[in-house]
């Protein structure tokens, strides 16, 4: 709950912004505690911003820890590197396919992502 409160107090979203994104990874808690705490955060953020948050996680983490159907309605940003296509068969919106990409004008390596949809679908995901 404190993390959700901190997020709400720190992040002001404007028209055209993507919904809040939560990077969820394994921590010391057991899977049931993790899922419970995650759902509390998601519900609080969704009530405040009136939009479903995006879950950013790895393909393996999603299949191991977020396999409960209560998480199926959330848009996913799946990190799955060094493969030709994302293996996750569920409803994913973004795929981060590398963390060592290159782009003109940027000296350091960068993350590269693909949106699973059209430009119009991407616009529909944004804050209105």
Feature annotation, model-predicted:
Residues 1, 28-34, 62-67, 86-88, ...:
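Extracytoplasmic/secreted cell-surface and envelope-processing proteins
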Residues 1-2, 34, 55-58, 72-74:
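A short linear-motif detector with a strong N-terminal bias
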Residues 1-51:
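Substrate-binding cleft of extracellular glycoside hydrolase catalytic domains
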Residues 18-24, 52-56, 75-78, 93-96:
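Structural recognition of the beta-strand scaffold that forms the well-ordered cores
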Residues 49-63:
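Aromatic-lined carbohydrate-recognition surfaces of secreted/lumenal glycan-active proteins
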Residues 67, 71-128:
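Functionally critical loop-and-helix segments that line ligand-binding/catalytic clefts
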